[in-house]
Amino acid sequence: MAYTFQLGLQDATSPIMEELTNFHDHTLMIVFLISSLVLYVISLMLTTKLTHTNTMDAQEVETIWTILPAVILILIALPSLRILYMMDEINNPVLTVKTMGHQWYWSYEYTDYEDLCFDSYMIPTNDLKPGELRLLEVDNRVVLPMELPIRMLISSEDVLHSWAVPSLGLKTDAIPGRLNQATVTSNRPGLFYGQCSEICGSNHSFMPIVLEMVPLKHFENWSASMI
C-alpha cells in the first residue's frame, strides 16, 4: 500500500507489476537522457556566440533528427506492447471471480462455487479497530489463493467504475453492459488495498478494495466455511 510522502511506485507483488516497474524505469531513463541533451543544447545556445551563417542545408543533421526519434519510439513501444499482451493473456485460470461495481460498494461472486457471493462495503471511520486503515478497510475481504492465476471479470450495475489494486498492477474499468477481464497473480501472501479509480458520484472515495492473498489450503478452508 502507499505511504505518506511516498515518491516511488508501490512494491510489486505480481509478475505484471514487476514488468510495469521495469518499464517505468526504462522509460524514465530515456526521458532523462533526452532532457539532458535538450538542456545541454539550450545551455550552448545561451553561453556561446558562435553562428554559421552560410549553412543552407544540413543533410547529416536532418537524417539524425529523423532517425533518432524513430529509434527512441521503437525502444519505448516494443516493451510497452509486450506488457500489454501479457496483461491481456489469461492461461488456464484456477479460479474466476466476478466483480460488480455499484454506487457505492463492490459485490463479488466466485463463479466456480455454487453459492459463494457477497457485498463489500467500506467500514466507517467510527467503527475501525486499532491498526485498521481509514477509508481502506471493508467488511468482507476478497480472499484468493496466492501463486495461482485468477481471472477477474469486472462490470458495473449502474455507472462507470474502475477496479484498481496498484501493488498487483491492476486497473480495469467497470462498464455497465460490458464484461472486462483481468489477471490476478500474487507472489506472496498479505493484504493488498485498492480503490475505485473512476469518479462515480458523491461517495466515489468510499469504495475501497481489499484482497487477502492466502495459501491454497487456507483458501479452501475459507471457501468451505462461506458456503
Swiss-Prot record:
InterPro entries hit by this protein: CcO_II, CcO_II-like_C, CcO_II_C, Copper_CuA, Cupredoxin, Cyt_c_oxidase_su2, Cyt_c_oxidase_su2_TM_dom, Cyt_c_oxidase_su2_TM_sf
Q: Which GO terms describe its molecular function?
A: copper ion binding; cytochrome-c oxidase activity
- Membrane side Mitochondrial intermembrane: which residues? 1-14, 88-227
Q: Which residues lie on this side of the membrane: Mitochondrial matrix?
A: 46-59
Copy out the cofactor comment: Binds a dinuclear copper A center per subunit.
Report which superkingdom the organism of origin falls in: Eukaryota
Q: Which Gene Ontology terms of cellular component type are present? A: mitochondrial inner membrane; respiratory chain complex IV
Q: Where in the cell is it found?
A: Mitochondrion inner membrane
Transmembrane stretches in the record are 15-45, 60-87
Q: Which family does it belong to?
A: Belongs to the cytochrome c oxidase subunit 2 family.
For this entry, the protein name equals Cytochrome c oxidase subunit 2
Q: Which species is the source of this protein?
A: Niviventer culturatus
Q: Which gene encodes it?
A: MT-CO2
